[in-house]
Amino acid sequence: MRPLARLRGRRVVPQRSAGELDAMAAAGAVVAAALRAIRAAAAPGTSSLSLDEIAESVIRESGATPSFLGYHGYPASICASINDRVVHGIPSTAEVLAPGDLVSIDCGAVLDGWHGDAAITFGVGALSDADEALSEATRESLQAGIAAMVVGNRLTDVAHAIETGTRAAELRYGRSFGIVAGYGGHGIGRQMHMDPFLPNEGAPGRGPLLAAGSVLAIEPMLTLGTTKTVVLDDKWTVTTADGSRAAHWEHTVAVTDDGPRILTLG
């Protein structure tokens, strides 16, 4: 990963050529396929480790490599974060899905040297109204951020759009959502995590410009309660500080002259 200090002075979010965006979209398609396979396999009695094995199989059969596996010592190909887990949940045989669970899966793949990164949230069977609203609000916040990925905007215009999407969802669903503090999106390309960091809230009009070819991984994380989190003893799993449930949606998105291009679609 390029040292962050070298990138903080950039005036433009790093750009990719048309061919490089196509290469990233190929990696993103692998991620999308893995997430579809996980979603199809998730059922009561299924362990989160078995979902990880499915993802790794799909990724490797596509000629790609899991981005997460071994990253700073991370031991799996996906992050499986269930109920009050926000992000970075480590899959295990002991963690078995049950009806009503709220499941967030984050997945990354590298193909021909280019990374794709995406996350989805879904229920095991029917969700409570609150959990359904939480997941939808998070997805809608993501869509709001994607819509702001246009030439001439600045980094925090995307952050502000995500926050505005969250506040609009609060009105739509008649409940408050916590925007998880300290976590957000990032640049992506030849490395999975690159500058700039993308907050999920904040004032608009600041930070580097978006230009054609700029790419960001946009990933809002919302809770039904607090904005605060705790990292468990495994040094990876992030949970809500108050035990409230959390949701996480993510896409890798490029700025083009024709508008936003989602690179993690199937």
UniProtKB/Swiss-Prot annotation:
State where a divalent metal cation 1 binds.
106, 117, 250
Q: How is the cofactor bound?
A: Binds 2 divalent metal cations per subunit. Has a high-affinity and a low affinity metal-binding site. The true nature of the physiological cofactor is under debate. The enzyme is active with cobalt, zinc, manganese or divalent iron ions. Most likely, methionine aminopeptidases function as mononuclear Fe(2+)-metalloproteases under physiological conditions, and the catalytically relevant metal-binding site has been assigned to the histidine-containing high-affinity site.
| Cofactor(s), names only, from the UniProt record | Co(2+); Zn(2+); Mn(2+); Fe(2+)
Q: Please state the Enzyme Commission number of this protein.
A: 3.4.11.18
Catalysed reaction(s) here are: Release of N-terminal amino acids, preferentially methionine, from peptides and arylamides
User: GO terms for biological process?
Assistant: protein processing
Activity modulation notes: Inhibited by various metalloform-selective inhibitors.
**Temperature dependency:** Optimum temperature is 55 degrees Celsius. It retained half of its activity after 10 minutes of incubation at 55 degrees Celsius.
UniProt xrefs under CDD domains: MetAP1
Q: List the disulfide bonds.
A: none
Kindly give the InterPro entries that the UniProt entry links to this protein.
Answer: Creatinase/aminopeptidase-like, Pept_M24, Pept_M24_MAP, Pept_M24A_MAP1
Q: Which keywords describe this protein according to UniProt?
A: Aminopeptidase, Hydrolase, Metal-binding, Protease
- Assembly, per entry: Monomer.
Q: Which HAMAP family match?
A: MetAP_1
What is the name attached to this protein's record?
A: Methionine aminopeptidase 1
Q: What is the lineage of its organism?
A: Bacteria, Bacillati, Actinomycetota, Actinomycetes, Mycobacteriales
